[in-house]
C-alpha cells in the first residue's frame, strides 16, 4: 500500500492526489541507519545518524510515494527508503526503489488511495 506523498512544491505546481501530501523542504530526510530508532522513517536535519536527503538538485525526488514496505513494524536491516519516485534522466536503475517518468506518475497519482496495493513480481 501507499502511505503518503512527498513532493517539491517549488517544482510540482499542479497535480491531483487523494492521499496525504507533505511538502518536501530543505531539512527533510529519510533515516537509513539501522542503529537509529528512526530507521526507515522521515526525519529532519540536522540529524546525528545516517539519512538520505530528500531535497535534491536532481529531480528524482520531486514526487515520492511512500510505500508501506518495512514500515509497521520496522525491522532493522530489512530495507529502508523503498519509494516510488521519478526516474533520472539516464533511466538508470535504482537502489531498491521503483522509478517512473513524470508524466505516467502524474497520470496514476489521482487513482491512488489508502487502499491501493502495489504488487512487484
Range-by-range predicted roles:
Residues 1-95, 102-121:
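Cell wall/extracellular polymer interaction/catalysis modules
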Amino acid at each position: 500500500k501507499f502511505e503518503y506523498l512527498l513532493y517539491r512544491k517549488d517544482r510540482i505546481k499542479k497535480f491531483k492526489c487523494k492521499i496525504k501530501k507533505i511538502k518536501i523542504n530543505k531539512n527533510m530526510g529519510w533515516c537509513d541507519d539501522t542503529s537509529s530508532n528512526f530507521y526507515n522513517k522521515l526525519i529532519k536535519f540536522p540529524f546525528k545518524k545516517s539519512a538520505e536527503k530528500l531535497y535534491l538538485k536532481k529531480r528524482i525526488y520531486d514526487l515520492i510515494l511512500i510505500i508501506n514496505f518495512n514500515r509497521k513494524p520496522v525491522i532493522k536491516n530489512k530495507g529502508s527508503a523503498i519509494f516510488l519516485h521519478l526516474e533520472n534522466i539516464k533511466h538508470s536503475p535504482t537502489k531498491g526503489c521503483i522509478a517512473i517518468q513524470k508524466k505516467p506518475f502524474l497520470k496514476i497519482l489521482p487513482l491512488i488511495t489508502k487502499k491501493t496495493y502495489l504488487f512487484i513480481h
